[in-house]
């Protein structure tokens, strides 16, 4: 099933003239790399599986033959709910070879998410593991088939246990001959639908063309001087933009090696880094924090590491400084599934840039900061961040109204993130438009208050959310996770700490909840809607006991 992609003719002509867009597809780039280095290791995972470029191509070609035999045509959606395994790349490449659209799904999704997303994207084939994390995902999906009428085939990825209820991927690869003729796909056609893991609401399907992905990853590799000599370590989920684009796609575009980790554990991650001599690691702030804590207690040889690229959330200064002391070059990157990545620091930027900014526009990308009416703001003023470039998505799948709100006719994507830009074009993300607490008419940035909380010596993790207040409308509530050595923290102690920080009193947290952990999605973002639900429930219980 094809999807009509609306391309702005002027933008398309400009990007083609500048060389960011062309006729070639991702499959064309794959074959260029394959011809150049067939015997090089392309991908390896922590379960011991590895493929050279040649063996990976043969496996993907066999799977492509099977997909075509099932009636799969260019534009049809193929979903795969896999962790960081080599088989993810096999399926992805098979989609490219057939012209099918890749729809990677998160392993953590269960019945509700799967039914909704698979129907939304009208997937015709789903690949799921026989077992993973003490569950059997394939057995979870089979009883749901009646609720997903468009799903024609379900394939069991029998990596950790045998397939008994669905066709096994391993057998399909053994029994099916390789594809003899590649399906021709144009660069303007849809390559992938990535469902955003937003902290609120149902996931939205972000539509990316081959040209979107190629321009994004080529610019990303160029800015960071990534080459065929590099080895990428990807601990983040491959169902998100970070893993899918930077952990799987970018390496094969430049002939590099991809090292995948299915379950993040700092010890396992460091062991892989040391064993495979990885040169770059990509992940959100929680990954960095956990690796740092582990390194401080159990040193590993990380001399091969060129840098750790950190995105998803702003890097706390303390973490950046600790990384520097441990010999880790920490670089900030900013982007979203809709526009990924579009701001990156330079490799040779001074530490002040890493600590105080989220980078500047990638090649071909424009960034501006706008007010509520979407008028550009002067340097230094806070407003909404917007980006335009060859990497920017084509809209949300079957969501024209949402697409129109986020993406204007001139190609600008409005992120919903609050931002400041300096005179050199470097940006600093300061929060979310929706992440503002309005207390008696005064706006409080949750990010600002969280940054102060994270400086408290007893606090390991923190989040600020609004709690309802009859008189002021909203007050701020702090959810904190304490460091292991500390057993308690009171609101009075927090207020005293804020007093020492000399910030306006209206920014002080007015309620404190100490928890064991904060709810995060797979990309590391705090799910604040769950915290808002929790504080409303807690307040209701307090009233009931009065």
Which ranges hold each PLM region?
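Conserved AMP-binding A3 loop
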Residues: 50-54, 191-215
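Conserved AMP-binding/adenylate-forming core of the ANL superfamily
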Residues: 22, 39-85, 89-93, 110-115, ...
């Amino acid at each position: 099933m094809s999807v009509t992609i609306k391309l702005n003719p002027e933008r398309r002509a400009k990007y083609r003239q500048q060389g960011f867009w062309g006729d070639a597809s991702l499959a064309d780039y794959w074959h260029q790399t394959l011809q150049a280095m067939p015997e090089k290791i392309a991908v390896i995972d922590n379960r011991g599986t590895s493929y050279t470029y040649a063996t990976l191509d043969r496996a993907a070609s066999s799977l492509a033959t099977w997909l075509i035999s099932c009636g799969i045509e260019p534009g049809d959606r193929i979903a795969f709910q896999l962790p960081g395994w080599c088989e993810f790349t096999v399926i992805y490449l098979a989609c490219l070879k057939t012209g099918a659209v890749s729809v990677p799904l998160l392993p953590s999704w269960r019945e509700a998410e799967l039914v909704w997303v698979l129907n939304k994207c009208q997937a015709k084939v789903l690949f799921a593991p026989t077992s993973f994390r003490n569950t059997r995902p394939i057995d979870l999906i089979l009883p749901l088939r009646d609720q997903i009428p468009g799903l024609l085939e379900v394939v069991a990825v029998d990596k950790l246990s045998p397939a008994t209820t669905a066709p096994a991927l391993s057998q399909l690869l053994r029994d099916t001959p390789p594809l003899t003729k590649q399906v021709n796909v144009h660069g303007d056609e849809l390559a992938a639908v990535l469902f955003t893991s937003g902290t609120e609401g149902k996931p939205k399907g972000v539509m990316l063309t081959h040209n979107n992905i190629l321009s994004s990853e080529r610019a990303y590799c160029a800015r960071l001087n990534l080459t065929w000599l590099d080895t990428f370590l990807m601990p983040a989920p491959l169902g998100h933009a970070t893993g899918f684009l930077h952990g799987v796609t970018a390496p094969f575009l430049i002939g590099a090696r991809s090292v995948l980790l299915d379950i993040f554990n700092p010890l396992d991650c460091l062991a892989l880094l040391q064993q495979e001599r990885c040169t770059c690691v990509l992940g959100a702030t929680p990954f960095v924090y956990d690796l740092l804590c582990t390194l401080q207690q159990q040193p590993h040889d990380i001399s091969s590491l060129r840098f750790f690229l950190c995105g998803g959330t702003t890097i706390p200064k303390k973490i950046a400084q600790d990384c520097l002391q441990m010999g880790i070059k920490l670089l900030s990157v900013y982007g979203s599934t809709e526009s990924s990545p579009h701001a990156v620091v330079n490799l040779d930027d001074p530490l002040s840039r890493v600590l105080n900014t989220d980078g500047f526009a990638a090649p071909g990308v424009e960034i501006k900061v706008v007010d509520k009416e979407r008028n550009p703001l002067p340097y230094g003023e806070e407003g909404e961040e917007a980006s335009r470039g060859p990497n920017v998505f084509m809209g949300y799948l079957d969501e024209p109204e949402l697409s129109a709100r986020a993406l204007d006719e001139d190609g600008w994507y409005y992120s919903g993130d609050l931002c400041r830009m300096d005179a050199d074009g470097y940006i600093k993300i300061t929060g979310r438009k929706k992440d503002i607490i309005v207390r008696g008419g005064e706006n409080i940035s949750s990010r600002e208050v969280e940054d102060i909380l994270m400086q408290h010596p007893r606090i390991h993790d923190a989040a600020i959310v609004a709690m309802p207040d009859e008189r002021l409308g909203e007050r701020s509530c702090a959810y904190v996770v304490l460091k292991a050595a500390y057993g308690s923290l009171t609101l009075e102690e927090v207020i005293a700490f804020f007093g020492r920080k000399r910030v306006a009193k209206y920014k002080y947290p007015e309620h404190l909840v100490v928890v064991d952990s904060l709810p995060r999605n797979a990309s590391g973002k705090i799910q604040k809607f769950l915290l808002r639900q929790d504080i409303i429930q807690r307040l209701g219980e307090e009233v009931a006991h009065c």
